[in-house]
């Protein structure tokens, strides 16, 4: 990142620690489901409800908390959100039963969307316009690192120690982030207060509605399978702790590659590229259970799964913003909620499939089917979209 001001760089680094911690607590559960299920003597499918609860909470509370806090000074809001994050993850680490753990996950998720929205705007306000993309990319790097490193090593620690150790580490990271915010972040009101009531017209745009529907249907297919990726790899490939860690790292590495690729796609090719990525995702889901019985093939398949899964969100989010024509604030907020609704829906459907069939293979069949529904909608969107919107955006840029 080419931001030269040392104080600004340190503030963004602190925000990265916070976003890493929040991303870590979101994804880490998927790597320790077996450990949690064994500790509380419940089915793995029941433990998967933790993923559903978290995603549903983000979906419902993110836009609401953001709107409530949008007129307040950034620093106390960020500190308050991180304080809730710390307490909720400490509650997770000490949870005496599954119900308390589920409640703590819902509480932790309640700050997720608001923190990201406020921190993103705050980071962009600290730098000149030409540096805003670099600032946002650096801050969001926390999520990428959480996916690539935090999840696999969280799974490893969960096996070597226990799942409570993972939440203890997340709590400690939250404390570090909180202290960093106290020391580095200036206390000032937002420069621009969005007029959210003027942005509801975004829902009149057909392509925006298409994008939300594609997100909910298509991306839920990812989480039908990914929610249970850790027990799937144990069962199919026979992986031990080290194998699970390597496979989850491969998924994260694939996610980084897919995200990077998606960021390079020109605006006029958004929907067409999205269709191609979704076809690839369906293909990976369809063959995964058949090739994952071979350890080396399982690693490769997991990498491709991550690449296709994380190649989709940037395309959808860019499509939403490009099609919103002035309602980008509410469009972006609802887009985040749509992804988390897909997360919750996928985890719930996956749990039902696992309970009903007792087979991990059917999870991938269900995931491929849901993604195929998203593919059909993407095709309709491509046939009906106005190319002039993207041509305008390109010429404007």
Curated annotation (Swiss-Prot):
Gene Ontology terms, MF aspect: transmembrane transporter activity
Keywords on record: Cell membrane, Membrane, Transmembrane, Transmembrane helix, Transport
PROSITE patterns: MFS
Record's GO cellular component terms: plasma membrane
Coiled-coil regions listed: none
Keyword flag Nucleotide-binding: no
UniProt key word Membrane: yes
Residue ranges of the TM segments: 10-30, 48-68, 76-96, 106-126, 141-161, 165-185, 209-229, 242-262, 274-294, 296-316, 334-354, 363-383
Listed GO biological process terms: transmembrane transport
Membrane topology: Multi-pass membrane protein
Subcellular localization, as worded in the UniProt entry: Cell membrane
Domain of life of the organism encoding this protein: Bacteria
Homology family: Belongs to the major facilitator superfamily.
Name of the protein in question: Uncharacterized MFS-type transporter YfhI
Organism, scientific name: Bacillus subtilis (strain 168)
